[in-house]
Each structure stands twice: as structure tokens, then as C-alpha cells.
């Protein structure tokens, strides 16, 4: 048996039967349920009400075809998905991912994680996620526009400002959000906050672009201060990825006194012992949409290496910001051997279960994704508030709220871990703290017969 509790084992067995072969989703459910062992001992009312049985089953899962015409006049067909996982504390909220790896399992895993992440923010937003196996890389702007319009034509039937609010994720940036919002507005003839991550000229929020990366560093800094009386100051930092999260995590880590020496993409990684020159990275990735290897051609003394060896670089703080399961047990061993003191996840579930176990066993401070990278969805919720009020807040106002939210997420997670006898285990603490609010809401709302 994977669980001490027969009840949790039964729940997990049923999830496995109903979702055969969905490895990402099953991995996420198992990790969360393991954290609930002390909760079901202490809260028999949760078991009696079948809260966890209901929690692991989405309220709604939508799959649809997305036909579109490429620049050669050929009809292409992709799959679209939206999982509306839980709305106990507010409308569904979660991003859209456009990537060839997107499938039912990935969307369900992301939507399930979103329940707890959104709850941890303290804001009234439920959990959802969506996307498509469409790959925007190598497509013209016209092709991306036609795809986005077709995708939104179907998705618009299922979302709304008070029902389900979407946002960006991997493969969905300002361009894609703009195309989809334009199509939604044409179809529904209304200007509402149904998508977040919008451009500033049509209802977007300042600091939304920076939010996930900044929030990751605010969380990590509070974790360092509270658990080890440390900070980013004079620490060597390695960050995987070179997209939005990695870029703004690099910026904030540097502002807080750290030295970021490495970034990566799917082909390899760069190492710059003098500290990453973020202006060069932004030019390559945001303006030219190039590959990270070009950094080594432009910055003397930096080195580009093909492959996935970024975690072999000696560092004090590691921030995986690329994709799920990028950091495995061997990588964890290497980081621990090289003296890492803190790891915090900027991507969704970037560390394998084996890696997480090794970090916790070695006493490495570990900030799980659902807590550490909640800054993006928190600021999305702040964008929803601004849209509802027909107001725009200053960058400083949004950033200050973001910082407070991330500090509170750390302390709520830490306090929950302490309350249930798992002090310092923020994986369990974040799961329990996020679950508590959702469970109470579900208890109050009863069961439909």
C-alpha cells in the first residue's frame, strides 16, 4: 500500500482505475494525497463528507476539436482542452498552454494543482486549466491568429468573467491572449475580464508579466529568512529556462543581491560566472525570439553547453523554471553534493518525486510549485479585480500586493506543516493549507443529490 490510510488508498486506487495511463495526473494526485495522511486522522468529518473523493474528480472536463487553415491553404486539426476542476471558493481560474505535449493527463494535472495554488493566494478563485497540442513555434502570426480564433470560438461557450477566467501559460503570451480576447469580444459582444494577461491598452494589469518570476523570489527570500536567517545577498543562483518566469526571476534575484550564473532552453544552457547579462537575454528571447546559445556569441567569457546538465553547476539557490519533471533524482544528488541550500519551483512540478524526497531528506529548503510560483495567478486575480472596478492600479500597488501575498503563502504553508507535525516540509504544508479552505467551502455547500 502506498498510503497508511485505507481511505486515501481507496481514493487513489479509484483515481488510477478511472485515469489509466495518465502519468502526470496520477503523480500529482499521489503527491497531494500523501500530504493528507495527518489531515484524515485529525478530521474524520472530511472523510465522512467524501470531500477528497470529490476533490480528485473534475467538476467538468471539456475536449474539442480546433480546425484551422495554414498559410498554404491546408486544413489542420488540433485538440483543445479545458478542465474546470473545482469552483468551491470562486470561478475557475487557470492558464492555457499551447504545446505539442498537451494532453488530457497534463491538463488534469495542471488543473488539479491549480486548486491548491489558487486557494493559497487567499483570493476567491477556483481551479482550472486548459490548452491545446498546437505548437506556435514556426507558425506565422496569421496562422497563430487563425488558430486562436478557432480555439476561442469553441472555448467561449464554456467561460465567463464569473464562471471561468483563463490566462496564458507555455506557448500563450501577449500575442495569443490578444487574438483570443478579440475573438471572444466579437462572439459575445461584451468587454469583460474573461482573460487575464491582457495588454495594458485593453484591460491588462501592470506587473502581470513580471509576477510569476518576482513572486518566486519573494517566496524564496521569505523562506530563506524565516527558516535559516539567510537571504539572496551574495548567493549564487542557477535558474533553468529562459522564458518569462526565468527572465523575471533573474531580474528580481539580482535586485535582492543574488548572482544568477546560468539559464537554459530545451537545447542546452549558458554559464556566465560574472552573472547573467539580462539585457542580452531579453534581446535574444523577447525581441529576436532566438535560442539561448546565442548569448555565448555575444558575451565574452560565457559558455554554452548542449544538453540538460544545468544542475551540475555549483550554486546556493536553484530555481527550476522550465517544465515538469526537468529535475530528477540524479540532479538532486548533484545539487546537494555541491552545497545547495534552497530549491524553489518556478515551473509546474519541475522536480520528480524522487528529487523532492532527496531534498527534504537532506534538509534543503524546498518551495513547491503550488506555493512558490503562485505569483502569476495571484496577479491575474488582481487583474480581475481591476477589470471589475474599471480601474488600473500602479505597478507599485500591484507589486506590493504580490509581495504580501507571497509572504503570506509561505507562512500559511509553514504553519500548516508545523500544525500537523511536519515542520519545515512545505510540500505537505502547502497542500494542507490550500486544501483546508477548499474543504471548508465544500462542507458548507453540501452535496448535490
Question: Which residues does each predicted region cover?
Answer:
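Adenosine-phosphate binding glycine-rich loop
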Residues: 2-28, 223-224, 336-449
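Structured beta-strand/loop patches that form or line metal/cofactor-binding pockets in enzymes
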Residues: 45-76
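Rossmann-like adenosine-cofactor binding region
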Residues: 268-366, 371
